[in-house]
């Protein structure tokens, strides 16, 4: 049996300490490795962000506004040497859209009605009556776009300049009355007919996109015309009913100056028209509170589809027969209960004489009849004389 003795113990009983020490250190190192593996690979905390993910996010989502020089460099566009481009394809697209619009407007009286509603305003001067649109012609020619070129403005932002020209006859005819409010309101009136036609327009259209980086505002498209535009009008007027004043030059100049001022104050640089671009990614908002919040209807129980009475006490109760016997369909049935039924007679107390009120007979249409009282008395006497079981 001595050959099966552990090598750590010598035959003389002396312990081999170097071997035992190495064996214990090996077991301890294996346990330590297993503990580290379980702690940091199996039960590791996943709340800390990954550094590599942050680096990838920083590369995908730039934080600053890309400079115009970088955009021009990556699109191989030089604002100084690049030649103006033709926009014939864009002119064709606009022509198709205008053709569809004109096809819908022609022969549609709703357009004139809509224009009349717009012109019916309380802001009209007191010497003018209601303005009615009597003629509308949106022309048959199409605008031409060309000579497009991208430049830098004074602040360094990019903007596109496009030449626009249109030669057509776009006509709007209206009728109204000039009122004389002295000595009383509408003391006299003079009919006035006016026709305004756009004959020619040419100018330089400027289009710019203003981005709103790192702000809650939406991106905008700014549209304006250069001050060196050309605008030609044809104005026809008629004043009076019997003796008419045709095409007064003073009236034509007055109307044309008003139209030019209106256009300049809204569409000519430095003034502009702006349009917001829709956002591709919108922030999700919290759902609105339920309509029944605070009223007891948001508990998950659906409301009854049937109308509920405002006062529950006003609901009619089922009628009761004399002696406390309810009749289920008494409120809906027109049949009178059979008092001579043996089951009905046996169910009544022997020592109690039923009392039939007048309302019971009123409901059945026999109020105050002697036949009903006679039947009740006969039933009571039969109960008194019948032997008890």
Curated annotation (Swiss-Prot):
Q: Does the keyword Cytoplasm apply?
A: no
Give ranges for the Lumenal compartment: 1-22
What are the disulphide bonds in this sequence?
A: none
Please provide the record's keywords in A-Z order.
Endoplasmic reticulum, Lipid transport, Lipid-binding, Membrane, Transmembrane, Transmembrane helix, Transport
Q: Name one GO cellular component term.
A: endoplasmic reticulum membrane
Topological domain (Cytoplasmic) residues are 44-389
Membrane topology field: Single-pass type I membrane protein
Q: Where in the cell is it found?
A: Endoplasmic reticulum membrane
What stretches pass through the bilayer? 23-43
Q: Which PROSITE patterns match?
A: SMP
* GO molecular function terms attached to this record: lipid binding
Q: Which coarse location class applies to the principal site listed for this UniProt protein?
A: endoplasmic reticulum
Which residue stretches does the UniProt record annotate as biased composition, category Polar residues? 330-341
One Pfam family cited in the UniProt record for this chain: MMM1
The similarity comment for this entry is:
Belongs to the MMM1 family.
Q: What does this protein do?
A: Component of the ERMES/MDM complex, which serves as a molecular tether to connect the endoplasmic reticulum (ER) and mitochondria. Components of this complex are involved in the control of mitochondrial shape and protein biogenesis, and function in nonvesicular lipid trafficking between the ER and mitochondria. The MDM12-MMM11 subcomplex functions in the major beta-barrel assembly pathway that is responsible for biogenesis of all outer membrane beta-barrel proteins, and acts in a late step after the SAM complex.
Assembly and partners are described as: Homodimer. Component of the ER-mitochondria encounter structure (ERMES) or MDM complex, composed of MMM1, MDM10, MDM12 and MDM34. A MMM1 homodimer associates with one molecule of MDM12 on each side in a pairwise head-to-tail manner, and the SMP-LTD domains of MMM1 and MDM12 generate a continuous hydrophobic tunnel for phospholipid trafficking.
Cross-referenced PANTHER family: SMP-LTD DOMAIN-CONTAINING PROTEIN, TEX2 PROTEIN-RELATED
The Swiss-Prot or TrEMBL note on domains reads:
The SMP-LTD domain is a barrel-like domain that can bind various types of glycerophospholipids in its interior and mediate their transfer between two adjacent bilayers.
Output this protein's name: Maintenance of mitochondrial morphology protein 1-1
Q: What is the lineage of its organism?
A: Eukaryota, Fungi, Dikarya, Ascomycota, Saccharomycotina
């Amino acid at each position: 049996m001595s050959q099966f003795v552990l090598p750590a113990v010598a035959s003389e009983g002396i312990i081999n300490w170097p071997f035992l020490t190495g064996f214990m250190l090996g077991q301890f190192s294996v346990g330590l490795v297993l503990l580290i593996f379980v702690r940091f690979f199996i039960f590791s905390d996943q709340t800390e962000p990954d550094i590599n993910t942050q680096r990838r996010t920083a590369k995908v989502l730039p934080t600053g506004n890309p400079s115009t020089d970088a955009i021009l460099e990556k699109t191989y566009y030089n604002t100084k040497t690049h030649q103006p481009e033709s926009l014939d394809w864009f002119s064709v697209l606009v022509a198709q859209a205008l053709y569809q619009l004109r096809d819908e407007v022609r022969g549609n009286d709703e357009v004139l009605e809509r224009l009349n509603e717009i012109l019916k305003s309380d802001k009209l001067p007191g010497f003018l009556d209601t303005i009615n649109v009597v003629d509308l012609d949106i022309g048959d020619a199409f605008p031409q776009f060309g000579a497009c070129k991208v430049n830098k403005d004074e602040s360094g932002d990019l903007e596109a300049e496009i030449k626009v020209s249109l030669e057509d006859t776009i006509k709007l005819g209206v009728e109204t009355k000039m009122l004389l409010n002295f000595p009383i309101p509408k003391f006299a009136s003079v009919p006035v007919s006016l026709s305004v036609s756009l004959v020619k327009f040419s100018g330089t259209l400027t289009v710019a996109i203003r981005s709103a980086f790192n702000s809650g505002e939406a991106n905008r498209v700014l549209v304006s015309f250069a001050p060196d535009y050309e605008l030609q009008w044809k104005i026809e007027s008629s004043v009076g009913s019997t003796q008419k004043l045709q095409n007064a030059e003073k009236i034509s100049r007055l109307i044309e100056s008003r139209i030019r001022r209106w256009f300049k104050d809204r569409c000519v640089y430095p003034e502009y028209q702006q349009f917001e671009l829709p956002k591709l990614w919108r922030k999700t908002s919290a759902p609105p509170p339920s309509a029944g919040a605070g009223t007891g209807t948001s508990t998950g129980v659906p409301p009854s589809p049937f109308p509920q009475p405002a006062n529950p006490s006003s609901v009619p109760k089922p009628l009761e027969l004399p002696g406390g016997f309810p009749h289920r369909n008494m409120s809906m049935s027109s049949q009178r209960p059979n008092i001579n039924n043996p089951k009905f007679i046996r169910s009544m107390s022997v020592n109690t004489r039923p009392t039939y009120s007048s309302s019971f007979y009123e409901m059945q249409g026999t109020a105050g009849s002697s036949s009903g009282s006679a039947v009740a008395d006969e039933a009571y006497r039969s109960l008194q004389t019948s032997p008890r079981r």
